[in-house]
Amino acid sequence: MPEKKNTGPSYETIMRDLEARRFSPIYILMGEESYYIDKISDYIATHVLKPEERDFNQNIVFGADVTASQIVDSAKAYPMMAEKRVVIVKESQNLKGTEALEKYFKNPVASTILVLCHKNGSIDKRKKIIPSAQAGGGVIFESKKLYERELPGFIETYLRQHQVTIEPKAAQMIADHVGADLNRLTSELDKLLLSHLTTNGRVTPEVVEKEIGVSKDFNAFELRNAIIYRDIYKANLIIKYFDNNPKAGSLFSFLPMIFTYFENLMIAYYAPNRNNEN
């Protein structure tokens, strides 16, 4: 997956550390993109402790249902017949007051892994909870939404991790149809992986059209090509198709791809040395 735009460690770095069982006592996972927050917290919930250890050593609560003091009390408890204790606070943005947590962060219990999942935005870094967590050896992860232009790369990387490749046009078709909701996007990609419709481990536009319901003839790729080759009739045909079928997608989602093409065209046109090598 592409490196995320974070102020701290990337998703990939955090996952490598978790897989190597290099745990931090505090994780503050925050941001607009819930996908990476869920992936990290779910991994901690399912991999740190053995199934038989979780009943007495793992607590998963919601921010609206607990106080900061109750979270601290749970975090201060020592593990029973296990190496670690895990406390995960989902939707911690609903937590009222963090003073008790700030105090706990000054001297966190080494055997406890405390995870705060703050969704739908990031914590103001000027608030004491962030520097307090950092001083206590905590990991601060900020998960931001991917730009539209980054979605095809995300799709290619996700499928490659499952030993499947995808044609650029097919990746763009999916990105335009689904958008930047990574939970929904990965759900659609999982459908592709389960469909067994790939040809020699490769996803084609025909597969996307059949499995996801995206037209291989009416999409951003075809609109861009129609503009490039000055095929006014085809360009208007595609525009009219989406105007008459709003559920098929929005023309506005095509703009990043078209803009990028003309941006690159201008860069090439005004380059000082326009030759094949440059």
Which residues fall in each region the model found?
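Conserved beta/loop motifs at nucleotide-recognition and modification sites
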Residues: 1-278
